[in-house]
């Protein structure tokens, strides 16, 4: 067979004529096993009750099996040619999504055996470079437009490509997925906090997800249930879009449940899996089922008929016989398969962390600015809280009579800034799904992502803190000389940031808002109780005296107290005078052994600790498991 000569642009693995260079994908004897988590439990029950294990159906193991491992796929094989639209079909739990994940090299758990060949050769590191995977859920940034979303992927997945070429590629993909009229429309959805952004329909979002996978012009694209959750019209549009891609040489492989007749007619090849075994792969499935004694009645959806017949075969006595017959037939067909030349292109390098950080930082800032409700509410809240604190303690004097009020002002300002990041719990967790999806696609590293998110958050928090502290300090008439005021702003900014890292680390460790709020609120009560305001540190019971040493709030609070009272002369309003100068106040509260710089240094160390904990929890925990 004579192949068309297509010149490659090696810089980012697309053909000069805009079409993808096709490949042949062959998989042989693919088996997949997972650990049976109930094995030990079943073993104990077996020994206890003396149950005969012969009742177990070894062809359809479940979690109640007495085997150490559960086999999900059994020696599955097949050939997928260039430019085919292939549908993996089967009832729920048959193994079609598992096979799709294995072919896309996205399976991160279990034990996989068998061979996966591209153009007759074992796959290597380059395999994922010319494959794309589209998940069942459309995980997209709600405030970005269609163009911005695809441009984001182009920036991170096409290293070494000029800006002009990236834009051309994005415009081409937008045209390919039929979203030219929606180019500048926002994706839309519900933001953290419940704010709804008007945007695309479900079918249009699915096409954006497909477009993200097409940015690198892949030779293979895998889709998990691309029509799931869509109405019949949107589902048909999606499948027509995929069919158009196959005409350009892209091989499309998708799992699909029960397509309507119009969709079924678009499919080039159907692979049917029942109970982990392949019973058919080809383009004449109705004829094959008829040869097995299952003719398709008139006026019946062929897809429904095929699925019903497959289920009946799986539950019948001929299941093993039919599976073995198909396996032998497929092995004979394999000897006559067409050999394509191997794909021999340079593997594009990934973008640098610095570049990833810059692109992600740009996206974070746009996301914040476009979420106007969140931005405005945070500024207004800072002004209101600062005004409330300042008004309650307005016009304080540098006298011994107002020492307690000054201490209260400093304490409640500290605790207010520590508690304000609680509102960010949903924000941290809402971005987690998007991060996991993008990380699984390997478009950026977790460190640039985390750093960009924290950079934006800290910048916003510094501004909010500056507003709140300025309003409060001016109304309460606390020390406003430049050095001490800006040091107070710096300390309060780190208190705010430390609390953000603390909440972020708990959110990344627990993965749920309920647990995060429960742990954070409990620990915050402990932090406030032993911060040194309610009970001076030198008056704490011995059993609890050590707690203030491991309390970040203590170091932040002591810093601003020392900053306020150090070398301050106090006026005596009544006799006897309890405090004549601020140093006596510092001594009374048991922090005379600390300096404002020393306390601030420990506060910075705590902030660094929670920053590191938050990052490592994000990087190593709650990864996408397939």
From Swiss-Prot:
SMART domains xrefs: AAA
Ranges for domain ABC transmembrane type-2: 373-621
GO CC aspect terms: membrane
List of residues binding ATP: 90-97
Annotated Pfam families: ABC2_membrane, ABC_tran
Residues spanning the membrane: 376-396, 409-429, 447-467, 485-505, 515-535, 543-563, 600-620
Keywords: ATP-binding, Membrane, Nucleotide-binding, Transmembrane, Transmembrane helix, Transport
Membrane topology category: Multi-pass membrane protein
Coiled coil regions, renumbered to chain: none
Keyword set includes Hydrolase: no
Main location: membrane
Gene Ontology molecular function: ABC-type transporter activity; ATP binding; ATP hydrolysis activity; ATPase-coupled transmembrane transporter activity
Highest taxon above the source species: Eukaryota
InterPro entries: AAA+_ATPase (IPR003593), ABC2_TM (IPR013525), ABC_transporter-like_ATP-bd (IPR003439), ABC_transporter-like_CS (IPR017871), ABCG_transporters (IPR050352), P-loop_NTPase (IPR027417)
Subcellular location: Membrane
Assigned protein family: Belongs to the ABC transporter superfamily. ABCG family. Eye pigment precursor importer (TC 3.A.1.204) subfamily.
Protein name per Swiss-Prot or TrEMBL: ABC transporter G family member 8
This protein's encoding gene: abcG8
């Amino acid at each position: 067979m004579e192949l068309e000569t297509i010149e490659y642009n090696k810089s980012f693995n697309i053909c000069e004529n805009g079409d993808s260079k096709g490949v042949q994908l062959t998989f042989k004897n693919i088996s997949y096993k997972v650990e049976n988590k109930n094995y030990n439990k079943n073993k104990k029950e077996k020994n206890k009750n003396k149950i005969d294990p012969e009742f177990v159906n070894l062809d359809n193991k479940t979690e109640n099996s007495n085997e150490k491992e559960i086999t999900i796929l059994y020696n599955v094989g097949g050939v997928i040619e260039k430019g085919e639209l292939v549908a993996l079909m089967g009832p729920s739990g048959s193994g079609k999504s598992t096979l799709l994940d294995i072919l896309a090299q996205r399976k991160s758990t279990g034990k996989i055996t068998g061979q996966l060949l591209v153009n007759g050769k074992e796959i290597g590191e380059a395999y994922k470079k010319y494959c794309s995977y589209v998940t069942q859920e459309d995980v997209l940034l709600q405030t970005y437009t269609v163009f911005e979303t695809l441009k984001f992927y182009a920036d991170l997945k096409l290293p070494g490509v000029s800006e002009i070429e990236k834009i051309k590629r994005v415009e081409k993909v937008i045209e390919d997925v039929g979203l030219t009229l929606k180019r500048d429309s926002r994706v839309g959805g519900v933001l953290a906090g419940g704010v709804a952004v008007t945007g695309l329909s479900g079918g249009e979002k699915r096409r954006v997800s497909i477009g993200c996978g097409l940015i690198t012009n892949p030779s293979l694209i895998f889709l998990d249930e691309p029509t799931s959750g869509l109405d019949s019209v949107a589902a048909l549009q999606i499948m027509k879009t995929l069919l158009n891609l196959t005409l350009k040489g892209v091989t499309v492989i998708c799992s699909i449940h029960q397509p309507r007749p119009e969709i079924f007619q678009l499919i080039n090849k159907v692979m049917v899996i029942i109970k982990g075994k392949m019973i058919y792969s080809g383009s004449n499935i109705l004829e094959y089922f008829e040869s097995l004694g299952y003719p398709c009645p008139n006026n019946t959806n062929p897809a429904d008929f095929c699925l019903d017949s497959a289920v009946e075969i799986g539950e019948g006595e001929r299941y093993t016989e039919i599976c073995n017959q198909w396996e032998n037939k497929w092995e004979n067909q394999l000897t006559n398969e067409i050999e394509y030349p191997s794909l021999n292109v340079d593997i594009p390098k990934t973008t640098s962390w610095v570049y990833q950080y810059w692109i992600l930082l740009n996206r974070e800032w746009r996301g914040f600015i476009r979420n106007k409700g969140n931005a405005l509410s945070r500024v207004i809240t800072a002004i209101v809280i600062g005004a409330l604190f300042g008004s309650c303690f307005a016009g304080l004097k540098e006298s011994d009579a107002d020492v307690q009020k000054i201490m209260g002002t400093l304490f409640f300002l500290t605790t207010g800034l520590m508690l304000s990041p609680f509102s960010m719990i949903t924000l941290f967790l809402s971005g987690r799904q998007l991060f996991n999806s993008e990380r699984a696609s390997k478009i950026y590293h977790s460190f640039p992502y985390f750093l960009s998110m924290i950079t934006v958050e800290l910048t916003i928090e510094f501004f909010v803190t500056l507003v709140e502290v300025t309003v409060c300090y001016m109304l309460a008439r606390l020390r406003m000389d430049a050095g001490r005021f800006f040091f107070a702003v710096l300390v309060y900014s780190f208190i705010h940031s430390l609390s953000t890292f603390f909440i972020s680390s708990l959110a990344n460790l627990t993965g749920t808002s309920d647990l995060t709020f429960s742990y954070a609120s409990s620990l915050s009560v402990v932090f406030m109780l032993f911060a040194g305001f309610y009970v001076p540190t030198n008056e704490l019971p011995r059993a609890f005296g050590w707690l203030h040493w491991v309390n970040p709030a203590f170091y932040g609070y002591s810093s601003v107290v020392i900053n306020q009272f150090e070398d301050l002369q106090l006026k005596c309003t009544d006799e006897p005078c309890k405090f004549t100068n601020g140093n006596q106040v510092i001594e009374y509260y048991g922090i005379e052994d600390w300096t404002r710089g020393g306390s601030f240094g420990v506060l910075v160390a705590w902030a660094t600790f929670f920053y590191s904990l938050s990052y490592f929890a994000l990087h190593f925990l709650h990864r996408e498991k397939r």
